[in-house]
Amino acid sequence: SVGVIYKYFTDKNTFFLQCLDHSLELLSNVLKEAVSEAKDLRGCIRKIVAALISNSKIHSNYNAMYNEIMSGSCRKYAKDLVDRIEGRSAEVYRTLIEQAQKEGMITTETDAGILAFFFDNLLMMMQFSYSCDYYKDRMRLFCGDLADDEDIMADSLIRFMEAALQMKPME
């Protein structure tokens, strides 16, 4: 019953923010693991995409909540929470891309922040494609039966990102 929620939380806003905090902690753990275990940007991308697909299916309710915030129906939260929600991934992605540019792993001279933004947009779309009904149907419309093969979808996204970032081929 909905009334049980108020036994543990003072109001629905407190409940919502607690759910958000938990989902952000999950995101932080995925990013920390990807950065600490991968040797370079290519490895990070592979780890992030694999974790994203897996976690999107396991934690689809958090992604639906995130989608709800972004859709405009939770305007009172959106402005205040954008730094809190996006700040973690934006900094990690920007730093990884800057490092890869300095090391010559990617050849594009496009600003790292802009690349991080587009990179995150692709990840976000994939995340929703595995957790929100509209985006699941959208993925199926574009990809047909291939949408059912997580390995093909992950590998295709990774190759697309590597091409977009103008990553040098693996040696």
Predicted regions and their residues:
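Helix-turn-helix
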Residues: 1-14, 18
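Gram-positive cell-envelope targeting signals
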Residues: 2-7, 27, 41, 59-66, ...
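Hydrophobic/aromatic residues within well-ordered alpha-helical segments
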Residues: 12, 19, 23, 27, ...
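Hydrophobic alpha-helical connector segments
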Residues: 18, 22, 32-61, 112-119
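Secondary-structure edge/capping motif, primarily at the C-terminal ends of alpha-helices
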Residues: 34, 38, 63-73, 130-138
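Short secondary-structure transition hinges
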Residues: 53-92, 114-116, 144-147
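C-terminal peripheral helix-coil segments that are non-catalytic and often amphipathic
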Residues: 54, 87-103, 121-171
